[in-house]
From Swiss-Prot:
Species annotation: Mycoplasma pneumoniae (strain ATCC 29342 / M129 / Subtype 1) (Mycoplasmoides pneumoniae)
Function, in words: Could methylate the ribose at the nucleotide 34 wobble position in tRNA.
Name of protein: Putative tRNA (cytidine(34)-2'-O)-methyltransferase
Pfam families: SpoU_methylase (PF00588)
Catalytic activity from the UniProt record: cytidine(34) in tRNA + S-adenosyl-L-methionine = 2'-O-methylcytidine(34) in tRNA + S-adenosyl-L-homocysteine + H(+); 5-carboxymethylaminomethyluridine(34) in tRNA(Leu) + S-adenosyl-L-methionine = 5-carboxymethylaminomethyl-2'-O-methyluridine(34) in tRNA(Leu) + S-adenosyl-L-homocysteine + H(+)
Residues that bind S-adenosyl-L-methionine: 83, 109, 130, 138
InterPro entries reported for this sequence: Alpha/beta_knot_MTases, SpoU_MeTrfase, TrmL, tRNA_m1G_MTases_N
């Protein structure tokens, strides 16, 4: 397994295919994955397992029974960023370099409802958006996660991942 400074947090994910695809992305970029219950599926859902391919034994995945449990069981020195279309910060404006020594947690809401208003208010200064063309309402959850992970890898000179594939 690996140790990572970046954490992807899915708040009550609803679509198994998205979660499976996010497992693959987290594995590819060596990111930790946190799932906050309740889910809209079972973890053994065949659609999720298929979308995760052969990454299930490689991903660092943590389950949390609630938001409160997540806060209690993760390190106190963490930066929590919420992904939302109304965010004022873009991923490139966040210092994601691993020498920052701070654990980064990027929280993604439900596919149909987003994040609860209470969280949006609590973290109003830590909201991130992926810039997209205005007529488009949103992009797929797993694509949004991939955008954040790519920026993380870019800021860290891709961790020599490209050289490992040559």
């Amino acid at each position: 397994m690996y140790k990572s400074a970046i954490n992807i947090v899915l708040f009550c994910p609803e679509i198994p295919n998205n979660t499976g695809n996010i497992v693959r992305s987290c594995t590819a970029f060596k990111a930790n994955l946190h799932l906050i219950k309740p889910y809209g599926f079972f973890l053994n859902d065949k659609r999720m397992v298929r979308a995760g391919l052969n990454c299930w034994d490689k991903v660092q995945m943590f389950e949390h029974k609630s938001w409160e449990h997540f806060i209690e069981t993760t390190p106190p020195n963490k930066a929590i960023w919420l992904l939302t279309k109304s965010g004022t910060t873009t991923p490139d404006q966040i210092n994601m370099q691993t020498d920052n020594r701070e654990q980064l947690y990027f929280v993604f809401g439900q596919e149909t409802k987003g994040l609860p208003q209470t969280l949006m208010e609590q973290y109003s200064q830590n909201q991130v958006r992926i810039p997209i063309w205005n007529p488009v309402r949103s992009i797929n959850l797993s694509n949004t996660v991939a955008c954040v992970l790519y920026e993380y890898a870019k800021q860290n000179h891709y961790f020599n991942l490209d050289k490992q594939c040559a």
